[in-house]
């Protein structure tokens, strides 16, 4: 039995559940208030917890796999194996001070107070730079602390910078880039490595297919080389012979979604026709 720990709430909850659905690991009999859930695979169950707690659960074997942010993994100092970057929940841990502050560089914070929800990461950031600061641990509303005299600076997460700007803060240092990671217990890898590899491959195949489309078209043999030059495929297009009155080929290729509009026009210009664009659910490399 493989137990997977997932975030029980937050902006990544729905994308993560959709990822598992796309991978064929459908969750059954679950609501957001449930702590556990079964899946269509009787050998896989899910448990739901705070993202911050998941690295510890995986490290101590309460869960075999988990999904959580790189920031929480680093903060916990968890001895786990990172298997996959899911590419979702992207954010950055930054060092910021009030816009009116004369401080422009991290070195100018020597001897001052820095508020954060990530004290271990913050201590390491300053220690590696030889800067002595007093770290003040808080549990939310970090942005307010410089304005009420609790701290001179903050280390906080931002994805767009909007919240920092609204709270009249400016970035003077970048601490850590984070996104959601699939992590594994080292003991579980040794014991259930095959099953864990199956789960990892299933999730990775969905991630690989994101932002890609499958193109199929008919191409006169005389236009084949020109068409091939226009296709930014994964490893070159697949070319198949077509039974037709005139020499014809079927060309298949995987193309980035954001290039479709340009590629179709280019293909038509050099002779491609009967072009089909098909969504891709999974790509297994």
From Swiss-Prot:
Cofactor(s) in the UniProt record: Mg(2+)
Transmembrane feature ranges: none
Stored InterPro entries: ATP-PRT_HisG_long, ATP_PRibTrfase_cat, ATP_PRibTrfase_HisG, HisG_C, N-reg_PII-like_a/b, N-reg_PII/ATP_PRibTrfase_C
Pfam families tied to this protein: HisG (PF01634), HisG_C (PF08029)
Domain of life: Archaea
Keywords, in A-Z order: Amino-acid biosynthesis, ATP-binding, Cytoplasm, Glycosyltransferase, Histidine biosynthesis, Magnesium, Metal-binding, Nucleotide-binding, Transferase
Keyword Nucleotide-binding: yes
Protein name: ATP phosphoribosyltransferase
Organism: Methanocella arvoryzae (strain DSM 22066 / NBRC 105507 / MRE50)
Gene: hisG
